[in-house]
Structure formats: C-alpha cells, structure tokens
From Swiss-Prot:
Recorded superkingdom: Eukaryota
Subunit structure: Interacts with PTPN11. Interacts with phosphorylated 'Tyr-720' of the ligand-activated receptor PDGFRA via its SH2 domain. Interacts with the ligand-activated receptors PDGFRB, FGFR1, KDR/VEGFR2, IL2RB and IL2RG. Interacts with EPS8 and V-SRC. Interacts with GRB2 and GRAP. Interacts with CD3Z. Interacts with tyrosine-phosphorylated LAT upon T-cell antigen receptor activation. Interacts with PLCG1. Interacts with ZAP70, LCP2/SLP-76, VAV1 and GRAP2. Interacts with JAK1 and JAK3. Interacts with PTK2/FAK1. Interacts with CRK/CrKII. Interacts with IRS2.
Mod. after translation: Phosphorylated upon PDGFRA, PDGFRB, TCR, IL2 receptor, FGFR1 or VEGFR2 activation.
Keywords in alphabetical order: Angiogenesis, Apoptosis, Cell membrane, Cytoplasm, Developmental protein, Differentiation, Isopeptide bond, Membrane, Phosphoprotein, SH2 domain, Ubl conjugation
Domain SH2 stretches: 410-504
Species name: Homo sapiens
Name of the protein this chain belongs to: SH2 domain-containing adapter protein B
Name of the gene: SHB
Length: 509
C-alpha cells in the first residue's frame, strides 16, 4: 500500500512527479451542436476539422464530436468560462486550417468536387469518413495545424493541394513494381513471365527509364501504353531510352552507346586527329632519316658497314673504328664547339646562324674601320657632325705617345671652355679632350666629364716638362701624360676615382 501511494501520489520524490493535468473540458456546447436536427451532414467534417485545428481542451471535444459518443457533464459552467473559451478559439485560430481561413475553404470545395465527380454513389460518405478519421487521428495525437493538414492530405484525393512541391509524386498505378525516389532514374523491369498478362508491367519491362520529378503519372501511363503497343512481341530486346535530361542509372544497359561508338563520332575529335597527323609525320621523318647516312656524332665508335657479311665484317670493322676515333677526325676545330645534336644538315636555321657568325668573325670589325677613317689620308682630322654616332668618341682608345699632339684625335686646339663643355655634355663619364689654355699661351687644359659635372685641369709646362695639376710626375709631352692616365687614376681632388677612358674625337666646324 505504501508503494502504491508513493508511486501515484509522488510522496517524497520530486523526480517522478507527473506534470499537472489539464482541467476536464465542457462538452455541453458540443452536445447542443450535435443534437440539432437541422444541421446538414456535410457540415460535420468541417466542424471536426475545425476542432482538430484547435489545441488544448478542444482536442477531446473534437474526438467526441467525430465519434458520436459524448461523455457525461461535469457540472454547470459559468458564462464567463464559455466566453473565455470562445475568445481563445478566435485568438489561437490556425491560419491554415481554422474555420475562417481561405485555404480551408478551398480545400473543402476541392474535396466536395472530387468526391462528387468520382462517379461513385458513396463518394460523399467516403470523403466524410476519411476526413473524420484524419481529424480523429490528428486530435488523438494533439497535433498542430500543419500536422492535421499532412494527415488529411495522405487520405484525400487531391494530394497537390496538401503537399509541398518537394513531396509531390506522380499518382503511379499499383501495377508498377518499383517507385523511384526523388531525383533518381530507375529502370523498371518486370518478371520474365509477366509480359502478356500484365500490360503495364510489360510496358514498363521494356526498359523505360523515368524520373518522378520530371514526368507525371499521366505521362508515364501514356509511355507505358505506347511501348505496350509497339513491343507486344515477347522476343524483342530491351531498349534504354532516356526520358529527360538526367544521366543514365548505373544498371542501365549501354546498347545505344556501344552502337553509337562503332560509327563515326560527331564529337570533338580534333586533338585525336592532330595526334594522328603528328604520328604520321614522325613516321615519315624516321623513314627519311633511315635512308640517310648515319650522322657523325650519333654512333661515333660503331662501324657504318651494317649490311656487310659476317665474314668480311671482322676485317672491315677495325679500320672503321679507327677512322671514327677523334684523333683521325679531319673536321675543322670549330666543329667541336657545337653540341652533338646541332647538325647543320638537319637544322638549316642554325647552320645559317653559325655561318653568319663565322663571316662576322672573319670580317674586320667596324670599330677598327671607324678608327682608321677618323684620320684623313693627309694626316688631318675628318670633320664629324654633331649628330653622328662618332660624336662621343671611341670607347677604350689607346693613346700612342709617339704621335705628336696635333695629330691626336682628342686634341681640339683653341676652343673655349663653354665649347668643351658642350661637347662633353653629350658624352658619358670619363670622357675627355685636350684644348689650348685661354690664360697661358704655352699651357694646355684637360677637360673631363665626371658624375658631378665638368672638370678642367691645367697641363702646365715647367722646364721642358708637362705636369698635370700639382701632384703628377713630369712628362716630356702631353700625349705621354694622357697615355699614362688612361690606365691610372687621376691625382686631382674630386676625380680620384676617374681615368681617361673615352676620348672625344670631335672638331668644331
């Protein structure tokens, strides 16, 4: 007895305590509605579905109204509680399945049209029983409005009004053996002996591939009927025909693909054709190379007489091996500069390039000709214009100290400092020229282009000697001074890193 009390009254144990139960509902209002004789029978499904949409205490009243059994009254209920419940039903009305929703009215109209147009005398009773059963199932589970709509759509005749687009399926007949899931292609096949007795099975056994989302039930029936009329014979082969844009399933036969592969394909075959052409071209080139003689560097130590008999090969091969040795090679020495795969016969472009290089090496350089042409035959200087390429002088010119100053190409005579700077302005660093000094008649000036501008150094004559600046050793002539500092640094402050590299061989016109 103590265990029973502890279990059912939860004495001293808060974990097993049951949740509070809702109060007993009032069924007097539902009894009054059900006992009215003037109420049409078609309104009962609406009332039951409306009751199934409501939650809380209305679920039990829905069940009692649909089943026809009414429980006993628990006592009188005040008008305040009835008004509160009516207001609660209006406030918490389901927007989809409530009594005033447009979707509910549309479903009721479609249900009546479907049951009336079915051609069966008991269509209204079937619809009523189905809706009442669905309403009872929804109320017993205490489902919401969405759950009641889903349960009613499973038994009603118009599924497209109750299911979403992702849940819709074509209304396939019962004779189809397999139902394809969503976004799948299934080849429907029947048993071996079911071709004559079952028209739909025989039609679907013909290898029709269909998708439930792409084609509807009527389209499937039309295809099955057409295939049954075409393939009535039992000995015809199955043909796989794709009914939509999906790819073939893994179990479909590749008869059409194999037949199409045997013929000439109309696809993109240019890479294969190009490869075939290149293979043919390489084969022709190999045939040509076989007809030619063996190149010198391909097999240097093997005999050339491959077609000689075995008796005479032993006597010929030592001589041929000796002739192929490098010391017996009679080719010129420059032939070894080229790699072994560069052959002048096989690569004419490279042969022309090498021939051009040899001609260029054998011919005199244009700089030497230009140096020779700078001096006139009479010993004078060749006048050169300002824009000519010889304006900046000759790079790395060697100065001959035995030549007199007047015949040197870098001597410009009596020109002013400004003219010398104008000539050096167009030249690079370490360019120089020698001119007469403007302050002393017997002295000379060395004008030099540096990275900071122009420098003018005096070549003073002291006791028959010439000195550059103040720290240079004495020289007998000006060409000796220039020749000495072409290979050494200048002893001038600010030009310690400079040498006389580029003489300016330009005369003013």
């Amino acid at each position: 007895m103590a265990k029973w009390l502890n279990k059912y009254f939860s004495l001293g144990n808060s974990k097993t305590k049951s949740p509070p139960q809702p109060p007993r509902p009032d069924y007097r209002e539902q009894r009054r509605r059900g006992e009215r004789p003037s109420q049409p029978p078609q309104a009962v499904p609406q009332a039951s579905s409306a009751a199934s949409a409501s939650c809380g205490p209305a679920t039990a009243s829905c069940f009692s109204a649909s089943s026809g059994s009414l429980p006993d009254d628990s006592g009188s209920t005040s008008d305040l509680i009835r008004a509160y419940r009516a207001q609660k039903e209006r406030d918490f009305e389901d927007p989809y399945n409530g009594p005033g929703s447009s979707l509910r009215k549309l479903r009721a109209m479609c249900r009546l049209d479907y049951c009336g147009g079915s051609g069966e005398p008991g269509g209204v009773q079937r619809a009523f029983s189905a809706s009442s059963a669905s309403g009872a199932a929804g109320c017993c589970c205490a489902s919401s409005g969405a759950g009641a709509a889903a349960s009613s759509s499973s038994s009603s005749g118009s599924p497209h009004l109750y299911r979403s687009s992702s849940e819709r399926r074509p209304a396939t007949p019962a004779e189809v053996r397999y139902i394809s899931p969503k976004h799948r292609l299934i080849k429907v096949e029947s048993a071996a002996g079911g071709g004559a007795g079952d028209p739909l099975g025989g039609a679907c056994a013909g290898g029709r591939t269909w998708s439930p989302t792409a084609c509807g039930g009527k389209k499937l029936l039309n295809k099955c009927a057409a295939s049954a009329a075409e393939e009535s014979g039992a000995g015809k082969k199955d043909k796989v025909t794709i009914a939509d844009d999906y790819s073939d399933p893994f179990d479909a036969k590749n008869d059409l693909k194999s037949k199409a592969g045997k013929g000439e394909s109309a696809g993109y075959m240019e890479p294969y054709e190009a490869q075939r052409i290149m293979t043919e071209f390489q084969r022709q080139e190999s045939v040509r190379s076989q007809h030619k003689g063996i190149q010198l560097y391909d097999t240097p130590y093997e005999p050339e007489g491959q077609s000689v008999d075995s008796d005479s090969e032993s006597t010929v091969s030592p001589r041929l091996r000796e002739s192929k040795l490098p010391q017996d090679d009679d080719r010129p020495a420059d032939e070894y500069d080229q790699p072994w795969e560069w052959n002048r016969v096989t690569i004419p472009a490279l042969a022309a390039q090498f021939n051009g290089n040899e001609k260029r090496q054998s011919s005199p350089s244009p700089s030497r000709d230009r140096r020779r042409q700078l001096r006139a035959p009479g010993g004078g200087f060749k006048p050169i214009k300002h824009g000519s390429p010889e304006f900046c002088g000759i790079l790395g010119e060697r100065v001959d100290p035995a030549v007199p100053l007047e015949k040197q190409i870098w001597y410009h005579g009596a020109i002013s400092r400004g003219d010398a700077e104008n000539l050096l302005r167009l030249c690079k660093e370490c360019s120089y020229l020698v001119r007469n000094s403007q302050t002393s008649k017997h002295d000379y000036s060395l004008s030099l282009r540096s990275n900071q501008g122009f420098m003018h150094m005096k070549l003073a004559k002291t006791k028959e000697k010439y000195v550059l600046g103040q720290n240079s050793p004495p020289f007998d002539s000006v060409p000796e001074v220039i020749h000495y500092y072409t290979t050494r640094k200048l002893p001038i402050k600010g030009a310690e890193h400079l040498s006389l590299l580029y003489p300016v061989a330009v005369r003013t016109l």
